[in-house]
Design a protein with these regions (language model features):
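A glycine-rich phosphate/pyrophosphate-binding beta-strand-loop-alpha-helix module
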Residues: 1-31
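Glycine-rich anion-binding loops and their surrounding alpha/beta cores
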Residues: 20-27, 32, 38-251
Length: 251
């Protein structure tokens, strides 16, 4: 994955912050990230925008001053700093339905062989855990298709749509900068702790979110024709420690 530490206008909980809170190196070079991806004992990596496109990252202050969402926010997620030798797939979340067509066209133009867009809550890649979810996707740069998924069919029974934040969040440190109303780093640590617990097989909403998102990804990549089988495989690697082993194998 790739991203930034924080960005206007929402200054939310980025995966940069969550991974850093989990003890991961978020300053890898593009080559270091590529090496981790190609290592079968690791198989994943994060590379920051500061490393793969410093000129774009230098616009952060300007974007903060503009405040409102800019067009660059839509297209920067498709930069794809690391590409596969055979195929490269794009996976992201969307909130507003009109964006699916836009992202699909952009993904094709950017050279992504496959594209998977999941109807989510802002900033995530997991559908609602308690109601039917929808994805739009294409294979081999073809036309978009739609698919509905019911979390109950995967054995997911939750009363919440997503893992809830605590009722009382740590207040943001005093600063002259425009920022979120809560301490983003402290909340990122909460998210990291919940994620590590789920990777260690602790069941709950975070565990179910991992099962759901990963199962959809495996289904889209045609690793499993049946998403229920994909979900069972994800549970297996969460419960036997393999998923956590791969997470810890990364820098």
């Amino acid at each position: 994955s790739h991203g930034v530490e924080t960005m206007s206008p929402k200054f939310g909980i980025t995966h940069h912050r969550v991974l850093k809170a989990a003890g991961k190196d978020v300053t890898l070079s593009v080559q270091q990230a590529a090496d981790q991806l190609s290592d079968s004992s690791v198989g994943w990596a994060y590379v920051d925008q500061k490393a793969y496109c410093p000129a774009l990252h230098e616009l952060t202050r300007l974007r903060t001053n503009i405040i409102k969402r800019q067009a660059i926010t839509t297209v920067e997620v498709l930069t794809g700093p690391i590409r596969g030798k055979l195929k490269t797939h794009y996976m992201s979340g969307y909130v507003h339905k009109p964006y699916t067509r836009v992202y699909a066209m952009l993904a094709r133009h950017a050279g992504f062989d496959g594209c998977l867009m999941i109807r989510v809550f802002e900033g995530g890649i997991t559908p609602s855990l308690r109601q039917t979810g929808k994805v739009f996707y294409y294979h081999d740069k073809g036309e978009e298709q739609a698919q509905d998924f019911d979390p109950g069919d995967l054995g997911i029974q939750q009363d919440v749509r997503a893992t809830p934040l605590p009722d009382e969040l740590p207040p943001a440190p005093e600063s002259d900068d425009v920022s979120a109303s809560f301490d983003a780093d402290a909340v990122a640590k909460m998210a990291a702790d919940a994620g590590l617990a789920a990777l260690n097989g602790e069941t709950g909403s975070t565990y179910d979110a991992m099962v759901y998102s990963a199962a959809i990804a495996l289904w889209h990549l045609k690793k499993y024709n049946d998403i229920k089988q994909a979900a069972d495989k994800v549970r297996e690697v969460l419960n036997n420690g393999e998923a956590l082993k791969h997470f810890h194998a990364a820098s």
